């Protein structure tokens, strides 16, 4: 699995991606990171990558010609790469989308800055636009890290216990509550069903709690799974 990241701040990577499970997988060669400095494709002595938008307006836009040279260099080395632009205008990034992206094997993530990029870049190269949520952040680098982390977790060999992937939140509802020792803490006890050692009862409880939490907090996930919203209580 190869991720090419196009950014004007290459030193931000690998950043958090160099730690824990994803970082270990990077060191083991289960995935690779190719960071490309967009500024190196600027044509002037100041390495200018942005300019004022036509028609006026606040801020600056990343230039199409500079981005084009950068993208072309990646396509020359990786002609089959999937082009993804992290943008607030994009389709919401989901677990399902993460699975789809992983199948491409080679992903190029363009990290926008300033007020975004010249729209012609998206159109000419047919970028898939992806948003990590309905909020604004300073640039696309953090969004790219979120996408990479989510995708890398599904690469074979990265997560040791395959059950961890199938039981995670968003597969078909939110994850059930989990507890560890001590059995009682600050007057709050672990549910008895989890202490009895009956695996069937535990699974039933987990399914029930997953459903209840999803109905209360994210009923839209149940619709995506083909479920119906029903009133429930934790009894």
From Swiss-Prot:
Alphabetized NCBIfam families for the sequence: PRK00026.1 (NF000648), trmD (TIGR00088)
Subunit structure: Homodimer.
Transmembrane spans: none
Family statement drawn from the similarity comment of this UniProt entry: Belongs to the RNA methyltransferase TrmD family.
HAMAP family membership: TrmD
Alphabetized Pfam families for the sequence: tRNA_m1G_MT
Protein name: tRNA (guanine-N(1)-)-methyltransferase
Assigned GO CC terms: cytosol
Binding site for S-adenosyl-L-methionine: 112, 132-137
Encoding gene per record: trmD
Keyword terms: Cytoplasm, Methyltransferase, S-adenosyl-L-methionine, Transferase, tRNA processing
One BP annotation, GO: tRNA N1-guanine methylation
Taxonomic source organism: Anaplasma marginale (strain Florida)
Its biological purpose: Specifically methylates guanosine-37 in various tRNAs.
A molecular function (GO) term: tRNA (guanine(37)-N1)-methyltransferase activity
Catalytic activity: guanosine(37) in tRNA + S-adenosyl-L-methionine = N(1)-methylguanosine(37) in tRNA + S-adenosyl-L-homocysteine + H(+)
InterPro entries: Alpha/beta_knot_MTases, tRNA_m1G_MeTrfase_C_sf, tRNA_m1G_MeTrfase_TrmD, tRNA_m1G_MTases_N, tRNA_MeTrfase_TRMD/TRM10
Subcellular compartments: Cytoplasm
EC number: 2.1.1.228
